[in-house]
């Protein structure tokens, strides 16, 4: 379950930002939302990621944070027929050109895992 390591990475990154904000004299009261970009080729189960995050964030300022995700589709270029487009990811992890069926392709993207932004709540 590699989702736990991803969830831990998210939590540690956000807690580091909260620590920085507090060192600037700001009173952080919580995090309400964390927005992620996740590539389809990471094969991360978003439901498992959310569950793992909820468990490890339980006693932190992130305990009420909602995780949102934007899934990033990989792009494919066929070296055989010149097709450029989106690669539809299946469980088989075959990278075939949807136009000619060739496996002589290049894949760009789809492996992203980024924290796009987070909504941090402060005490005025």
Swiss-Prot record:
Superkingdom of the source species: Archaea
Binding residues for Ni(2+): 2
Record carries keyword Metal-binding: yes
GO biological process: protein maturation; protein modification process
Binding positions for Zn(2+) per the UniProt entry: 78, 81, 97, 100
Record-level Gene Ontology MF annotations: nickel cation binding; zinc ion binding
Keywords, ordered alphabetically: Metal-binding, Nickel, Zinc
Annotated family: Belongs to the HypA/HybF family.
Function comment: Involved in the maturation of [NiFe] hydrogenases. Required for nickel insertion into the metal center of the hydrogenase.
HAMAP family: HypA_HybF
Protein name: Hydrogenase maturation factor HypA
Organism, as annotated: Methanococcus vannielii (strain ATCC 35089 / DSM 1224 / JCM 13029 / OCM 148 / SB)
Organism lineage: Archaea, Methanobacteriati, Methanobacteriota, Methanomada group, Methanococci
């Amino acid at each position: 379950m590699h989702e736990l390591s991803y969830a831990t990475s998210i939590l540690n990154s956000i807690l580091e930002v909260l620590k920085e904000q507090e060192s600037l004299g700001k009173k952080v009261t919580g995090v309400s939302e964390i927005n992620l970009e996740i590539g389809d080729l990471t094969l991360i189960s978003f439901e498992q990621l959310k569950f793992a995050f909820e468990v490890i964030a339980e006693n932190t300022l992130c305990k009420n944070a909602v995780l949102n995700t934007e899934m990033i589709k990989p792009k494919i270029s066929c070296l055989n027929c010149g097709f450029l487009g989106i690669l539809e990811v299946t469980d088989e992890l075959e990278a075939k050109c949807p136009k000619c069926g060739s496996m002589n392709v290049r894949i760009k993207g789809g492996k992203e895992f980024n924290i796009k932004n987070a909504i941090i709540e402060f005490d005025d």
